[in-house]
Amino acid sequence: MGKYFGTDGFRGEANVKLTVDHAFKVGRYVGWYYGGEHKAKIVIGKDTRRSSYMFEYALVAGLTASGADAYLLHVTTTPSVSYAVRTEDFDCGIMISASHNPFYDNGIKLLNGNGQKIEAEVETRIEAYLDGLIEDLPLATKEDIGRTVDFASGRNRYIGHLISIPSRDFKGLKVGLDCANGSSSAIAKSVFDALQAKTYVINNQPDGTNINTNCGSTHIEVLQKYVVDNGLDIGFAYDGDADRCIAVDHKGNVVDGDKIMYVCGKYLKEQGRLKGDTVVTTVMSNLGLYKSLERESMKYEQTAVGDKYVAENMMENDYSLGGEQSGHIIFSRYAATGDGILTSLMVMEACVEKKATLCDLAKEMKVYPQLLRNVRVADKKTARENSKVVAIVKEVAKELGTDGRILVRESGTEPLIRVMVEAGTDEICHEKVDRVVKVMEAEGLIVD
């Protein structure tokens, strides 16, 4: 059976790996699956890619053909779909987006009734249907055919929700926003304007093909220059669907997800709002984050890479803050998934309440030099479990001791082994990574 869903939904080049036929069938199965005992209600959002409209129509056709009602949020963010599912009694949410990928890619992300990424068993059933392993589903007829409903009001309610969160307004503060020509273009400025910030926005003119192109959280250098050149107090960059956020302080320094978790974790702990005094991270967070959390008497948990796993850990243990270095940050009091705009509001609240600049708050965390090398291999499992690779990794880990670490893991979406080392200097990082890669090369595991 084919494996279509990865760590972040069904994603690939539009009409190459992910086709309108796939989207129609996903709609057919989802509409049938959730309509077993009642008429299913499914809410759909999309980002600004040209192909997002095409996939939206295909999904709606599939859903309504199976008897489900499809509610359209139109261009919006992934977290707004999650919010709508949780608060408006929908059975399921669908976001059409490939997040930070280039415009020619797209994806289908499914959210369960709690607004979180859908269970793996449901994805497996959809994959079986896509492969023809499940018999044809019945078509709705007459009045049982589903309706298509304009639900732009749901996006407006989400905006109101965001505005209600900060404890104070941001009056007088000059805030730069890089919307990546993506979903946040329709939302972010109105939120900050309502909170009385002086808002400066770039890359908020989507044309269907410019999403993430030299802009947004994956091209943070654009916002760095903009903040410094315009004398702004702070800046925030989002990705295509605005479920992640990277910040920039007034000096142009990048504040990534690890530093954001430190700043917000310390602030929430001081406020008595950090449940269990614990921050949930992934194995890719910087060693400096862990040492800084320990210094401030905070605990931490580590999960596999992916905000899906962070969210699961937070829900199981009732934690209030977690996230990834990449900027997926979850504040469980307000959201079930990573939310870039919410994250920027919480960073702003910490700065305003503590009467401090982001530069001052973030510099308390020392970042350890980190080197990540992606190695293309013929077979990920074979490469990772090779006895000589295992031996060199253990040897390097022993040498690093408590002043560094090594992590070797498989990519969830590509034929890559990721070799990551953190240590006291860049030179040590390079030396350790080189040794591991040379062993992989000598073992004939690497492909060009």
Locations of the language-model features?
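An N-terminal, well-structured beta->alpha segment
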Residues: 1-61, 65-66, 145-174, 381, ...
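Buried hydrophobic positions in well-ordered alpha/beta secondary-structure cores of metabolic enzymes
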Residues: 8, 44, 81, 94, ...
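Gly/Ser/Thr-enriched, mixed-charge loops and adjacent short helices
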Residues: 13, 106-230
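Short glycine-rich phosphate-binding loop at a beta-alpha junction
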Residues: 39-47, 174-176, 277-283, 418-420
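N-terminal small/polar loop signature for handling phosphorylated ligands or for N-terminal nucleophile
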Residues: 41-105, 190-248
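Phosphate-binding and adjacent anionic-ligand microenvironments
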Residues: 234, 271-448
